């Protein structure tokens, strides 16, 4: 059976794209008198309308989703072109303040709450002390700029140790006494992780790989052998397990896909999820069902709205500071709550607190992203509902299915692989890239996957959009357009790496959630998307 899809492109009179016809679904592109994109629409499904200022910056974005919801987000800038104010669709707003060097030093909201403050930084420009609500957070780094500890009162106190290759060899929760030690093979792939508490061994885990294909052959928490390519299947596509793990329900899970290869439907027993995508092929609506219970989630930039079957509306606002996600403001059917967010070095959510640091919910994950009991790392998570569904590297957990939606693709943290292949071979010189179902080259503690299609080094290293961009420009002889950079050159990646370390801004936390309509998705993503997309398409971007 052919899997080819016919896509027709119709140019505008001035050489600009006018229409894209994908199997009868037409995406229309309109432009203003200055040839700026003014509207993208799929009739009856999704529309985006853009308003610009005199410097061609987007100041207003209006979205219509399925003719059911209309959202307007606005952005204003100061005289230096920095984002001064961001207004969410329901009128809630955040304000940014900067020092004389252009560093973000504070984020406040419509109610004058001090959400985030930058207090001090080291010589590299990495933030060492910040304040979230009324609580100070301290971060220390080793001589290479890698994180050695992150602490905040009685909320979190994490310690990290990296080897000379940059791989994490241990992490410790000094509040609970937990420690996890890691070992790697010659390809830097994780091979074992062992948990102890108060120096007493709790659990040992291991994983093995096929030496030819790089696929996982066994994983101790699964407990059975992985089979690939059976019945003329693809050599990297999982086709069987030699038994049924206890953590997998005795039900058939069915997944269907759109013609652009993103998950459309998931069903498991009485549970189901139906996703709708917008003009940018990012999810805009999800209908979640569990038996008779139903709720709908709409996604629009750094704002989400949940509507349950009784019509109650939960409005979720994600707010970024200078070192990633800083807070979440929730209006739950008129009841307002604000949470400060505390994340690990990869941007995974560890705790939600009130403004005074009182912990409301804690979270923990194994190296592959499985939820586990924060009070007992050897045990799996038993809770089924959380204040927010964001967690591992700030992606959206689909807890009813045991999956994580990583924007471009859906990931199974128990199996340690994606459900579908990566559309890109990111680094053709690295043979591990040809296992396109694999997660982060088998090195989940060094990389994150913000888009579900591209692995990035840990956020604290290459998170700085500005630093990485500057380094890439230098490496390519002053070429300012990242679409024209040589991504096959080690010099490009090396200079981007160095520039990001010097920049010291962990903006990859924002990148991790850009594709899903999360923090930084509306404004900073506009600045960063050219760099990001060029990186994972080898410079072949449509703009």
Segments predicted by a language model, with ranges:
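A cytosolic small-molecule/anion-sensing beta-strand core signal
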Residues: 259, 345, 412-414
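Short, low-complexity export/processing leader segments characterized by acidic and small residues
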Residues: 352, 370-375, 409-419, 423, ...
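Extended, hydrophobic alpha-helical membrane-active domains that insert into or remodel lipid bilayers
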Residues: 451-543
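Residue-level signature of beta-propeller blades and closely related beta-rich strand-turn architectures
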Residues: 64, 174, 396-398, 410
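Peri-catalytic substrate-binding/gating loops that frame the active-site cleft of hydrolases
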Residues: 112, 365, 420-426
